[in-house]
Amino acid sequence: MHVRYDLNACESPVEKRGGDPVSVTARAVSLLAAFVVVAGLATFVAIYFIGGASAMPTVHYAASGGQVNVVLQEDPQNDSASKPDWVSYYVQDPATQKWVHTTLFSVPANARVNVTLYGYDGCTPLRNNYFSQVQGTIGNTVTLSQFDQHGKEYVTDKTTPVINAWSDCNVGHTFAIPGIGLYVPVASPNAPLSANNLCSESPCTTSGNPYAKETFSFISPARAGVFRWQCLVPCGGGFLDGNSGPMQALGYMMGEMDVVSS
């Protein structure tokens, strides 16, 4: 006697609400695809966030009299071997006064953080002029000076709540710490200087290069924690929507502020 087995008998159709049967195999394939996507995202996080952060130095700032002075610069390029053409931040080591190619720094909790930010990259009109407004600093203002390549100051110590990127080409990026509600437009050299005379070797220096110098202050959180900061202007040229590449990479235009218990 010959017994015939139906090889498809194990695949019992599952009736969807819409009435279309979905086989067990199809469901398994869908679950596998979802697992691959989740695993890929986890790998991305591990490599670009956890692994990237552990590979970079952290610049530590200590408070004096309840205040700490953080010094940053953003450049149109950097001195790395892997992505030298990516726009990037540098952090000044307070002990050596040397510029460190990192975007990780630490500050004490509940301290006044005085930031000096040198902007060497060229101007890019903001896609949304909402980000021209200064938010989250003490007084919701910044103080701005701008210099040409000869050191001539053409804007002097201007304290303002707005750096209007639509009325003039004078903003290169933004410096934002969303977790504490801080949003600051980062001033740049003007349009003619941006077109012809930008710094070409990083870390940039004030000698022989046009730049903007911007100062502002904020109070660090009272609790310890790691707070992401980044540029929220989609100006990553050559990348989808301008938000990829250096805009989302640790060590370039995204970083972390580590708030430590004082």
Model-derived features with residue positions:
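Extracytoplasmic entry segments of secretory-pathway proteins
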Residues: H2-A165, I177, S261-S262
